[in-house]
Amino acid sequence: MITLIELFAGIGTQYQAFKNNYEVKCIGISEIDPRPLKAYKALFGEPNNFGDITKIKELPKSDVWTYSFPCTDLSIAGKQEGFEGKHSSLIYEVYRLLCVSPKPKVLIMENVANICNTKFMPQFQDWIDTLTELGYTSTWQKIKANVYGGATIRERVYMISILNTDIKYNFPPAIHQDKVLQDFLEPVKNEYYIDEYYGPTPSITKNFFNSVKLCDYKNGGQGNRIYSPYGMGVTLTATGGGKAGSSGGLYYRENKIYKLSPIEMCKVMGWSKEQAQIICSALTPREVGFCMGNAIDLTVLTKIVKGIKEQNIL
């Protein structure tokens, strides 16, 4: 059995991805937001929560640490303060803990695609170099969720770092996607109906590579664009900005405009219907949108962890 510590644990996607591949024991997490913690407890029971990462003195021995630190200062929607911003600078707490704790064999990071843009790539490279000095060999890749079988075009950077080896992790090749958003949806419910649809007649030809925008709704801003369910889903966001589509976007269904239900938001992020029901029983619909918008795509991370197992890294 391998052991896992989840820093910035969220709802526990990292733990579930390992459970999907290994016999694993999560020996502790660090999470201070009560919203994802409610979902975590509902899914896995009461965790050993170390609490605020800035107050952790050291961590116990573990095979794996995950540290998908806050993207707030890296995101396009944020203030673009980078690794020195109030929230994203918490990555340096991971460095501090690596210096005073038994080092894990594997480190896993996920963050927004913006982390490797022209502005932030020097800071990201500095972090990779820091891990190298600590004995880690790192490999990173920018991945859209649908490339690994996910329901959306959510694009994120993933990095695997391995201790005391020259062997690099090889990210799995893209799969042949055979599903579109429609395949993840539940039967239509009127409570998620927004308005009548007067846009162009959508094609039912499936697009496995991208979302298919049909037209704008109202001002056409984020959350006010209508998409075909026969393409890939758009990226879920933690805040809908009060727009009609909230966290999950708007979709044409049965000649009307609908938003995703809380159950559907969980499913398009890789959770089973049974798990989605557990999450939704613990959270309000708004909290589900917040947590799924902040979450890691479970389908993608399960595939990445499977690669760790197949390459005999753990």
Regions found by a protein language model. Name each.
Residues 16-20, 42, 96-99, 129, ...:
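Short, well-ordered alpha-helices that flank and scaffold nucleotide-derived cofactor binding pockets
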Residues 1, 25-26, 62, 104:
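Local beta-strand N-terminus motif with an aromatic residue
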Residues 19-23, 42-45, 78-83, 121-124, ...:
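Short, glycine/charged-enriched secondary-structure capping and boundary segments
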Residues 70-72, 273-274:
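Short connector loops/turns at beta-strand edges and beta->alpha or beta->beta junctions
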Residues 199-314:
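C-terminal target-recognition/interaction regions appended to catalytic cores
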Residues 2-55:
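SAM cofactor-binding core of SAM-dependent methyltransferases
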Residues 12-14, 70, 80, 151, ...:
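Gly/Ser/Thr-rich beta-alpha loop segments that engage phosphate groups in nucleotides
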Residues 55-64, 71-235, 239-242, 255-258:
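Class I S-adenosyl-L-methionine
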